[in-house]
A protein has these predicted regions:
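Polar low-complexity intrinsically disordered regions enriched in Ser/Thr and small residues
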Residues: 13, 230-231, 259
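Bacterial N-terminal signal peptides
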Residues: 7-17
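Positively charged n-region of N-terminal signal peptides that target proteins for export
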Residues: 1-4
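A composition/biophysics-driven feature that prefers long, compositionally simple stretches
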Residues: 19-215, 223-238, 242
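Acidic, glycine-rich loop-and-beta core segments that form the ion-binding/anion-interacting portion
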Residues: 234-259
Length: 259
């Protein structure tokens, strides 16, 4: 369709932007990414999480996820490389005050040195019993879980898992269950200085991709469509192993235009 074709002026406008773009930023290979990701996660768990738990007045936080139905925050809490929860994966964070936040996993499969394994294995019923024991031994004031009617990212505990948890804890402990909404949102929105540095590099990669997308390497005036440019951006990210959050959208618009 005619209105999807780039006019020559679009190329002229974007050439100056492309020429001012910085040199290409190197993208780490899949093999080398986990070391960086896990160093950042270790810092977050050791320094950021204790502060956020105290600011939100939560002394115990549970994140429980099932394979193929992850909690939205699950992958932000576990070491890489990892694609999903395994079977039923239970993470327990308990604030011990000056001793720091204890990080436990009550799960069939270990999570490396970041988490202390608190279960030696067994069937699913034994796993829930062990979780209840871990919680009772620590006697928290609040048992925060990911349940929220406002923030989807903080609403990761399914109804069936909630029922399993409440049943395993019994009436006394289950009465302490509360929403971890504030903590979950703070965890997801807060970046450490080291992460900010990485994000800045990510922005540079996005900018250099956009610069190339709007250059003569990609656009032929009167031929290239906005859809072509959008798919170039998408393909470029995919080729670098950088999964986009959403499909790129490219459109033309300016004051006085009749489209």
């Amino acid at each position: 369709m005619r209105h999807t074709i780039f006019p020559p002026i679009a190329l002229l406008i974007t050439l100056s932007y492309a020429q001012s773009a910085s040199a290409d930023v190197a993208v780490a290979t899949y093999e080398h990414r986990p070391a960086v990701q896990n160093a950042l996660l270790t810092e977050r768990l050791d320094t950021l999480l204790p502060r956020l738990m105290r600011e939100t007045q939560i002394d115990m936080w549970l994140v429980i996820a099932r394979e193929y139905n992850d909690d939205p925050v699950f992958l932000s809490l576990v070491p890489k490389p990892r694609f999903t929860a395994r079977r039923t994966t239970m993470l327990v964070f308990f604030d011990r005050g000056d001793a720091g936040v204890e990080k436990l996993t009550v799960s069939r499969y270990p999570l490396g040195s970041m988490y202390e394994a608190a279960w030696e294995g067994g069937d699913l019923n034994a796993q829930w019993r062990r979780l209840a024991e871990v919680i009772a031994e620590r006697d928290p004031k609040t048992i925060a879980v990911n349940s929220s009617d406002l923030w989807p990212v903080a609403d990761g505990l399914s109804h069936s898992l909630y029922e399993k948890l409440a049943g395993a804890l019994g009436p006394t402990l289950s009465a302490r269950i509360a929403s971890a909404e504030a903590l979950t949102v703070r965890w997801m929105e807060t970046r450490t200085p080291a992460e900010v540095e990485v994000w800045q590099r990510g922005v540079a990669i996005a900018r250099q991709t956009i610069a190339k997308a709007f250059s003569s390497e990609v656009i032929t005036p009167g031929v290239t469509t906005v859809g072509d440019v959008a798919w170039f951006i998408r393909t470029r990210f995919e080729e670098q192993g950088l999964e986009p959050w959403f499909h790129p959208d490219v459109n033309r618009q300016w004051q006085g235009a009749d489209f």
